[in-house]
């Protein structure tokens, strides 16, 4: 087997015919500036070729279902093992997916509860029992010796009906007595009960005096009772009037409540056997939100106070409301706030009494008719039958999702929660953090019987191993019940990493995309140990990463550069960490200290105003009061899971969105907020793509393309031909090439081979038709402009202020190497974020804007971080406020104000440890962030 992976002539995206040799069974880090070609090399070349080779092993029949993969633009790759990519993307949007299901710990947990749990009565709380027929006979002989008893089988439990047919059937079988609603009565011919009342009927199978001599008769009658009662029976003591229940199933001996024997599906919220019937195992229910249905109570019905109904129209709906108003003393012109509680409830939820409505205006038959007003809620609810996205979206805007009122968010049936292991049910265990769960599972065997211990031994071993892997990658603060949809990209990636470590595969090539995302410096060492564990098992590990600790731990480093875009795509250095230090790359400059991000000499005083949130207690926050001083660069820090996102993204952001834009986003619980009046705009800048289609590009997103098209409209050529600005858009008919619809390429389907993209034969890849391309400005047509880099375009349009200003903003954020027409889907997360920031830079602001960024350094090299900080500082220097959630110490150390949350993740976090300057935080002994800042000399 080869000891290296050899790549020859890689030309994917901006790679410049790269030849590279990477050692196998080593930890390899690929680093370089954002946009330099790291992901192109790791994912779009190595991983893509590995996947393509796997697909080629499938039959042509199978390939038509799973699709085929495009061959990457590379001459040859040798020494390639089976490839597994662990990316940042949170692809799982399934509401049923949780940390427990993804890691498969839930499967083992369900097995543990099915085989080694104890059931407890939901009525009395006593342990439920499980007997064989012989054991039941012994219990009856021992407990009722010498007494006269009746053996009874329950046949009807709390149901309405006359049951004449049942009594006739029992009489034909020779049964004489039954206990009906607590009274033993003789079964007579034609016997029937009140059909509208609820009844409980127990069949008297036998009456006997208990003695050892009567054991045979007792066994015969007991078996018949079990047959008639479907595994359940009762013994009635004539002397005391008391009864006791027995079952072949689990049963409460005092009340007779019985459960079926548990199976793994009993504890699965994805199975009808275990899922809560009210929420179908989702743990939450949709309820109508009055604030969304009636957003402004000062408006009248005629003015459109009820959002789903809209403004007054002369139709049957408003005619019914008018008649309803006569009954509840309101008119269509009264503000909703003046309605009585009964009147508002009638409007929203309907009225039981029919309304008399004159239909002459709405129907040719006319006349007065009785109509039932069903209410606005029913009107909205009818769209449940509308499967269209539009119908569902319309309905969902009036709903809010709350914890299920029946299962309390556990997702399971009540019966499943009566089974306990070491005193906890499966929902309670799933709600523990992984660290707490690991502590509980370490001692659980001590509370088990010998039999339970033998059954659970192997199951517990598997669970413990998986928990250890999750803790090793820094996810001890998560719970198994945590929805996968709520995980960040970094958390999802580390969960998949833990799962892969647990799979114990060997000779696999793993490719990871910045696994340190969202991880505090404190947890970095454990993550590196996990990657080393993968490597030491005989696997090759390639990591796209910028973290210095990760580089120091690597066996081999590949530095891609020297710059980004067209100025990147080459291997500027490769080898050990020491080899990289000796190179003259930008990465080496930062690692050696030749370049650094300097700590500012002084901090901004701010405006003196602040936003204060009091009593924030969402998720794990402990009723904290957080102050955000305005006019400053604020960094919210803390270990993973401490509560940073809860405070900023789930509390502060929705509060501001509701106040400024009447957003429907609901903040997590808090007591009060003050200072919102000091800001007039909220901007959230994330790393999501600037568009979902390849047609979106830097020119369209920054809106500079509109100005460029208007400029082309004003050229003499366009004026003569009568071309308007729309003629120069490749998204609409008119100026674009209709053969390729403005894409520049045509797709040729190859059935069992990957689709082939060829340059459009009509336009030659220029996107536009010949007439449009004949229009020129300064000798360049519209396609030439789209193929310019931003740097070239800044010079080309220097005399057009509206265009130059927007392009200069893109250049200032370090993206001058991008072409104006570069598809948005090919941009990295860091590039997308900086495009968005450039759009903000080019706008005029009032100096009262609040910017929120969540981990903006994701995917950024040291040099990219310097450029990002330059942009953020410009925004703050204008008087605006920037709040970032961040772990990167280069960002933290230059902030004006820090809010450090902790001390740990999960339940052990949620407190504001210290707030102040980086120097203040460095002096806090409880703060992990402070510890690392202190090591930097603060």
Each predicted region: which residue ranges?
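Conserved phosphate-binding elements of NTP-dependent enzyme cores
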Residues: 1-938
